[in-house]
């Protein structure tokens, strides 16, 4: 294993999902374009969408990467590590501090999320309707988290 894979310096997305990001920039779909939000925020949004699914294994990585590590904001980094902790099933706590594994997991879920975004794009849903749908889903998840059994 080379040093780059052991100590990654960027977050990557697949080549297919790079095309989806380009389409978001072109269409300004849901204001997810680079003029409206940072790449860190877009990555986090995609990762959040993908987090409730089976992650997509990364086959073809966009060679330029998506976000250099120095550009990852603290909120995104905290969420990446929180995702790793929440998905951790082993007994070795060193796994949740292994940056290579943490980034790999985040990238897999983000790439899954970009595929979900692609489905939204191809369904040609109205951005406002989609936003309300996502808010209803978030409300439902919040209720599930905060419902105390009687």
Give the residues covered by each predicted segment.
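Charged, low-complexity intrinsically disordered terminal regions and linker tails
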Residues: 1-31, 44, 56-150
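Short basic helix-loop element that most often maps to the first helix and adjoining turn
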Residues: 32-36
């Amino acid at each position: 294993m080379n040093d780059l894979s052991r100590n990654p310096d960027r977050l990557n997305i697949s080549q297919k999902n790079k095309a989806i990001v380009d389409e978001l920039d072109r269409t300004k779909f849901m204001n997810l374009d680079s003029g409206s939000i940072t790449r860190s925020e877009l990555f986090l949004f995609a990762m959040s969408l993908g987090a409730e699914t089976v992650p997509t294994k990364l086959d073809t990585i966009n060679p330029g990467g998506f976000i250099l590590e120095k550009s990852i904001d603290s909120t995104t980094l905290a969420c990446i590590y929180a995702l790793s902790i929440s998905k951790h099933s082993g007994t070795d706590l060193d796994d949740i501090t292994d940056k290579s594994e943490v980034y790999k997991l985040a990238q897999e879920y983000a790439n899954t999320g970009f595929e979900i975004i692609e489905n939204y794009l191809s369904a040609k849903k109205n951005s406002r309707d989609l936003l309300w749908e996502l808010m209803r889903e978030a409300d439902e998840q919040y209720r599930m988290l905060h419902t105390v059994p009687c």
